């Protein structure tokens, strides 16, 4: 067993569950790539007939990547053989700890024809986002179209920017919903590239010293899916790097953002899930309490009246507006993503209430943008970049349509937790759906079927980090809204 379903307050769950198990067998493969052998794993029946005398080091059967997204000089390693799991099983949430919805069967693993996608204005449910997650993945790995020039490709080998919001973890999100071998392979490769550049202090060497680039989420997934234990030290070093950021807000701090706070919490949550460390367990609980205190007004340091739910701080601390107190709805998404994950190891009402209040705050940030950036013929519903205590526009640039998907997904979590707490707020659900319509229009707007003739990607992703900010945290929207089926209680009795 590599990991049970850990719980910060109910130790009994440790002995009642298995989250990740490493299984080694000897198997002579009959198929060669791109074909695959199909194996069935069963438990609870007859005892196995064979035992391996010792577990082998998974890295003993890896090789240097020499084609595609990396070449030999990049020194990226990958397994000789991948175990690809069914998407219906992966969608139960074994990786990210929350249930998602598997891709519709019509959404194949191949890149869709851009002209065909541009011609379809709307898809049922959240299928527009699912198609975009997949199609924009090909842009992210520079496989949109062979005619895209080097200057218009994502510079992920030399520049930090494409890695912001965790490029590799977003690939694992795609894998967990699609079951795509290509997504899994690129995720493992990207993780190996990233892990090789986690320096001695736990920072990403392409952005040394900047904790908003310090992640361990993808390394946890690669460890769980391949058994590669060489990632464990780097997972811990990222936690050490994040300790350099002070998440407890006060007016005296020179710097504070929701983004940095979120990645600190997430690093500790992920490392706790991997290691079970009591120090990490207690730190996660402490950070959650500190954030609740901040949301409650930071012991009177945030004045009233104010729109409830936001994590208010000054624009000078944030770096984007003046001395006034404000909060960022779209950066708050990063916080709620980490807290939803932390909820899985605590299941406490206080954390659920935090998420409900944050969903209400995000909802309060929505405005109608008269500029109609996607050419729909009507004002677009969008969240502000940052809001003041009274809900006003702190940044002064109006609605931010490019952040519609992730904000909609986390207003959806607000609805989910209102239901979990016994007082559903259907207005939150509807607002999430309304905001999703803005995102839906934007997907089509940025598909440019003829662009490759000019050296540009047909599926435009600009800046490259956009793929991560939209999709890494938005994978559970359909589940949270109960679009595919009535949403079951989160984390009840593990995953049955």
Q: Which sequence ranges carry the predicted segments?
A:
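Catalytic cores of extracellular degradative/oxidative enzymes
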Residues: 56-486
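Alpha-mannosidase-like glycoside hydrolase catalytic domains involved in N-glycan trimming
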Residues: 1-55
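Low-complexity, intrinsically disordered/propeptide-like segments
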Residues: 5, 59, 314, 493-494
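Short acidic, low-complexity intrinsically disordered linear motifs used
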Residues: 488-496
């Amino acid at each position: 067993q590599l990991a049970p379903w850990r719980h910060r307050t109910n130790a009994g769950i440790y002995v009642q569950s298995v989250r990740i198990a490493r299984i080694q067998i000897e198997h002579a493969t009959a198929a060669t790539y791109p074909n695959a052998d199909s194996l069935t794993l069963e438990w609870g029946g007859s005892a196995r007939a064979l035992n391996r005398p010792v577990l082998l080091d998974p890295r003993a059967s890896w090789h240097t990547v020499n084609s595609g997204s990396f070449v030999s000089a990049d020194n990226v390693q990958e397994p000789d053989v991948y175990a690809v799991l069914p998407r219906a099983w992966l969608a139960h949430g074994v990786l990210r700890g929350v249930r998602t919805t598997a891709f519709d069967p019509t959404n194949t693993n191949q890149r869709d024809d851009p002209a065909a996608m541009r011609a379809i204005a709307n898809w049922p449910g959240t299928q527009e986002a699912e198609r975009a997650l997949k199609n924009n993945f090909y842009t992210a790995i520079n496989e949109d179209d062979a005619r895209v020039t080097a200057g218009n490709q994502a510079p992920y080998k030399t520049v930090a920017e494409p890695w912001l919001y965790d490029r590799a973890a977003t690939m694992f999100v795609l894998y967990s919903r699609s079951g795509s071998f290509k997504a899994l392979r690129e995720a493992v490769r990207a993780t190996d590239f990233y892990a090789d550049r986690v320096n001695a202090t736990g920072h990403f060497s392409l952005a040394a010293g900047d904790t908003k680039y310090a992640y361990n989420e993808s390394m946890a997934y690669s460890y769980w899916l391949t058994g590669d234990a060489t990632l464990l030290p780097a997972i811990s070093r990222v936690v050490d790097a994040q300790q350099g950021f002070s998440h407890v807000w006060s007016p005296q701090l020179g710097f504070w953002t929701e983004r940095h706070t979120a990645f600190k919490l997430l690093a500790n949550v992920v490392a706790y899930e991997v290691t079970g460390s009591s120090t990490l367990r207690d730190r996660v609980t402490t950070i959650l309490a500190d954030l609740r205190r901040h949301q409650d007004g930071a012991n009177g340091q945030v004045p009233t009246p104010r729109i409830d739910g936001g994590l208010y701080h000054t624009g000078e601390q944030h770096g984007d507006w003046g001395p006034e107190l404000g909060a960022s709805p779209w950066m708050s998404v990063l916080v709620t993503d980490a807290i939803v994950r932390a909820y899985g190891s605590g299941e406490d009402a206080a954390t659920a209430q935090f998420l409900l209040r944050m969903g209400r705050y995000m909802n309060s940030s929505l405005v109608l943008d008269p500029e109609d950036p996607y050419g729909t013929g009507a004002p677009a519903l969008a969240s502000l970049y940052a809001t003041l205590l009274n809900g006003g526009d702190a940044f002064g640039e109006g609605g931010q349509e490019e952040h519609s998907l992730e904000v909609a997904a986390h207003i959806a979590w607000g609805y989910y937790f209102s239901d979990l707490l016994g007082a559903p707020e259907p207005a939150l659900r509807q607002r999430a759906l309304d905001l999703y319509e803005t995102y839906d229009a934007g997907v089509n707007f940025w598909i440019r079927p003829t662009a490759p003739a000019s050296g540009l990607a047909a599926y435009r992703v600009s800046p490259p980090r956009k793929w991560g900010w939209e999709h890494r945290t938005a994978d559970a929207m359909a589940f949270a809204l109960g679009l595919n089926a009535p949403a079951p209680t989160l984390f009840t009795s593990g995953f049955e």
